[in-house]
Swiss-Prot record:
Ca(2+) 1 binds at residues 28, 33. This is Protein S100-A4. Residues 13-48, 50-85 form the EF-hand domain. It comes from the Eukaryota. Its main location: secreted. The modification N-acetylalanine is found at residue 2. GO terms for biological process: positive regulation of canonical NF-kappaB signal transduction. Calcium-binding protein that plays a role in various cellular processes including motility, angiogenesis, cell differentiation, apoptosis, and autophagy. Increases cell motility and invasiveness by interacting with non-muscle myosin heavy chain (NMMHC) IIA/MYH9. Mechanistically, promotes filament depolymerization and increases the amount of soluble myosin-IIA, resulting in the formation of stable protrusions facilitating chemotaxis. Also modulates the pro-apoptotic function of TP53 by binding to its C-terminal transactivation domain within the nucleus and reducing its protein levels. The lineage of its organism: Eukaryota, Metazoa, Chordata, Craniata, Vertebrata. GO terms for molecular function: calcium ion binding; calcium-dependent protein binding; RAGE receptor binding; transition metal ion binding.
């Protein structure tokens, strides 16, 4: 039986590999692969309209080694940043249900 966090990690890894390597290095996401991943897997993050300038800036910020691709480590940093933003957002809300022990 997989635990929720194990399932989350599996989804994180398998989602990266679902999109990486379609057009090149199988261990990296190029610009179009990253855009497809975000559009299909994180549609709320991009919103209804994709601003090309904003996407270019995101790609540039994620691509720490400036190879014009996002590797798994860069992808993990991105997901970690999103998780931290979500956590900060929800810290301001009172609990509606008691926490499970």
């Amino acid at each position: 039986m997989a635990y929720p966090l194990e399932k989350a990690l599996d989804v994180m890894v398998s989602t990266f590999h679902k999109y990486s390597g379609k057009e090149g290095d199988k261990f990296k996401l190029n610009k179009s692969e990253l855009k497809e991943l975000l559009t299909r897997e994180l549609p709320s993050f991009l919103g209804k309209r994709t601003d090309e300038t904003a996407f270019q800036k995101l790609m540039s910020n994620l691509d720490c080694n400036k190879d014009n691709e996002v590797d798994f480590q860069e992808y993990c940093v991105f997901l970690s940043c999103i998780a931290m933003m979500c956590n900060e957002f929800f810290e301001g809300f009172p609990d509606k249900q008691p926490r499970k022990k």
